[in-house]
């Protein structure tokens, strides 16, 4: 499950992929498959969630890693270079490295 907590111990990435609407689901499916097959099994992986913008022009990945070093090691893994090449060929990735400062949940089941 996704972890969203204001923990300074986690490295958080929000990656917004600008994409043509006809490629949105194809890119999402690719990201999900690579995460399932490789990324989630790598040291330091905590969680990843994928979101589709309603206008069809973005895929958003919210991911957390145990540390920036773990994230950088994943990014340098040669097995993932074809994945990164594919993403750049069909989209315009914009990685945003974040610090979670606040996270709120519903106060009652009705709000959930």
From Swiss-Prot:
Keywords: Antibiotic biosynthesis, Oxidoreductase. Its EC number is 1.13.12.21. Pathway: Antibiotic biosynthesis; tetracenomycin C biosynthesis. The keyword Oxidoreductase applies. Inhibited by p-chloromercuribenzoic acid, N-ethylmaleimide and diethyl pyrocarbonate. It comes from the Bacteria. GO terms for molecular function: oxidoreductase activity. It is an enzyme of class 1 (oxidoreductase). Residues 11-100 form the ABM domain. Coiled coil: none annotated. One of its GO terms (biological process) is antibiotic biosynthetic process. Pfam families: ABM. It catalyses: tetracenomycin F1 + O2 = tetracenomycin D3 + H2O + H(+). Gene3D superfamilies: 3.30.70.100. Optimum pH is 7.5. InterPro entries: ABM_dom, Dimeric_a/b-barrel. Oxygenase required for conversion of tetracenomycin F1 to tetracenomycin D3. Homotrimer. This is Tetracenomycin-F1 monooxygenase. It comes from Streptomyces glaucescens. The gene is tcmH.
């Amino acid at each position: 499950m996704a972890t969203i907590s204001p923990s300074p111990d986690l490295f958080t990435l929000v990656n917004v992929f600008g994409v043509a609407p006809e490629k949105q689901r194809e890119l999402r499916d690719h990201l999900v498959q690579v995460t399932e097959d490789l990324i989630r099994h790598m040291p330091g992986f905590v969680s990843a969630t994928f979101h589709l913008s309603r206008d069809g022009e973005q895929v958003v990945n919210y991911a957390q890693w145990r540390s920036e070093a773990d994230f950088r090691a994943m990014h340098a893994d040669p097995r993932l270079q074809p994945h990164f090449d594919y993403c750049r060929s069909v989209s315009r990735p914009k990685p945003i490295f974040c610090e979670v400062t606040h996270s709120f949940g519903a106060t009652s089941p009705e709000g959930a």
